[in-house]
């Protein structure tokens, strides 16, 4: 059974045992967090029914580098910056 959960105003379609990366959370590794479950998919009535899901924080990591390149033509102006977003890896324990 799958569920649509919401963490930090972002929605994820998950099932039990999935490991996903979410925006950084204020929790230490090993903590269990309850998050809002918007809908359970795979039941006879897949209507919007709010509930809770439990996720376990595994690790805090940084995402891949995203290159931000700016240029102004004919002016010899170029800027190249990199950005790495802080992410939290969580595992869905129960829906």
Swiss-Prot record:
Keyword Ribonucleoprotein set for record: yes
Q: What are the GO BP annotations of this UniProt entry?
A: translation
**What Gene Ontology cellular-component terms does the record carry?**
cytoplasm; ribonucleoprotein complex; ribosome
| Keywords, in A-Z order | Ribonucleoprotein, Ribosomal protein, RNA-binding, rRNA-binding
Subunit note? Part of the 50S ribosomal subunit. Contacts protein L20.
Q: Which HAMAP family match?
A: Ribosomal_bL21 (MF_01363)
Kindly provide the name given to this protein in its UniProt entry: Large ribosomal subunit protein bL21
Q: Which organism is it from?
A: Prosthecochloris vibrioformis
The encoding gene is: rplU
